[in-house]
Structures are given as structure tokens and as C-alpha cells.
């Protein structure tokens, strides 16, 4: 893994996404500028934290960060653009939503969207860079809450459990009930359920 060198600048934003793999719902991104004067203990990749810990950290991040913002790309945008381009768009939206413009942006992964300030992609950034860890927590808590809300409207699909990912249960219910308007029609299993696969 390439050694990561933290940029020498004051206002660094971390950006991460949640929801590239699911068959349903938006891809959600977050951008966070942490306050060096108000450190947050225990930041880590959101997937490595318990739900209870994520929720507590989410509130602490919102309270202590210099600025934070959420971005998203809806299922119809994912279908029109493809998941990679939709994710880049959602990241741009998260950065644009910050009320303080960052001097530098660190993005989780290996690709950067076009941004009006310098940016760098950091592989495994969600466990290496506190700003990206914070962004991953905000994005995951937000998207999980959306899946729980969707589960109330469509209880037969089990969205609260699998968060829209293509589990055996989700695929079984997709075949049984068809797709909701929140499903991503460009994704193979949804296409097949709708009879659109060629």
C-alpha cells in the first residue's frame, strides 16, 4: 500500500460513500472537516463499528466538526449515469454542501471526482484518515436510517436487515414481489426481476 502523507493545510475535508452495492435506494456520501481543537476518540471505518457506537459517533461528529455535509445520487441517477459516475456526483454534492470551503479533500478509494480544490484518493482511507472515517460514519448512519424507513413502507423485502444489498432473502423477495420504484433498474438482479435482462 502506498504510504499516505497527510496534506500540510488547515482545512482538510474527508469524503466517503455508502451504498454502491445495494440494489435499492440512493448512494449516500458525506464530507467532513474536523476541528483539531475538538478531537473525537474512536473514529474508524463505519463497517468496523457497532451500530450503537456509530450512532453515538454520528452525533458527536455533527456537534464537533467545523463543517459536515451529506450528498446523494438517487436510483434514477444511478440508472442514467452508472454507479461510478453517480457516486462521483454524490461526492461533489457533499463537498459543495460544506459551509466552509476546504483547502484540500481526501477521498476514500482510488478515484477522485472533479472538484474546485486539490484532492487525493486514499485507498482504505476510511480506516487511515480520521476525516474520511467521520464521513463514512455519517453516510452509513444516514443510509441505514433511510433503509429502515423504506422497510416500514415495504416490509416484505427486509430492507432494514440487508440494507438493500443482494442477499439471498432480498433476491427471493425481488423475484416474488417484483421491484419497487426505489430499486435500481440498471442492476442485473433487478433487470431480471422486471424481465428486462437480455
UniProtKB/Swiss-Prot annotation:
A divalent metal cation binds at residues 16-17, 108. Keywords: Cytoplasm, Endonuclease, Hydrolase, Manganese, Metal-binding, Nuclease. It catalyses: Endonucleolytic cleavage to 5'-phosphomonoester. Manganese or magnesium. Binds 1 divalent metal ion per monomer in the absence of substrate. May bind a second metal ion after substrate binding. The gene is rnhB. This is Ribonuclease HII. Its EC number is 3.1.26.4. Its cofactor is Mn(2+); Mg(2+). It comes from Escherichia fergusonii (strain ATCC 35469 / DSM 13698 / CCUG 18766 / IAM 14443 / JCM 21226 / LMG 7866 / NBRC 102419 / NCTC 12128 / CDC 0568-73).
Amino acid at each position: 500500500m502506498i504510504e499516505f502523507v497527510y496534506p500540510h493545510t488547515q482545512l482538510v475535508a474527508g469524503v466517503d460513500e455508502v451504498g454502491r452495492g445495494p440494489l435499492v435506494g440512493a448512494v449516500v456520501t458525506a464530507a467532513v472537516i474536523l476541528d483539531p481543537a475538538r478531537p473525537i476518540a474512536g473514529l474508524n471505518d463505519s463497517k468496523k463499528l457497532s451500530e450503537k457506537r456509530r450512532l453515538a459517533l454520528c452525533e458527536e461528529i455533527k456537534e464537533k466538526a467545523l463543517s459536515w455535509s451529506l450528498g446523494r445520487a438517487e436510483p434514477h441517477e444511478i440508472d442514467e449515469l452508472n454507479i461510478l459516475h453517480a457516486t462521483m456526483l454524490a461526492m461533489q454534492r457533499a463537498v459543495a454542501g460544506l459551509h466552509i470551503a476546504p483547502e484540500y479533500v481526501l477521498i476514500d478509494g482510488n478515484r477522485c471526482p472533479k472538484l474546485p480544490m486539490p484532492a487525493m484518493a486514499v485507498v482504505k482511507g476510511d480506516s487511515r484518515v480520521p476525516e474520511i472515517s467521520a464521513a463514512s460514519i455519517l453516510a452509513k448512519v444516514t443510509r441505514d436510517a433511510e433503509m429502515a424507513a423504506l422497510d416500514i413502507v415495504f416490509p416484505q423485502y427486509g430492507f432494514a436487515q440487508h440494507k438493500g444489498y443482494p442477499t439471498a432473502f432480498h433476491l427471493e423477495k425481488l423475484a416474488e414481489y417484483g421491484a419497487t420504484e426505489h430499486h435500481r433498474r440498471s442492476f442485473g438482479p433487478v433487470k431480471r426481476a422486471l424481465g428486462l435482462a437480455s
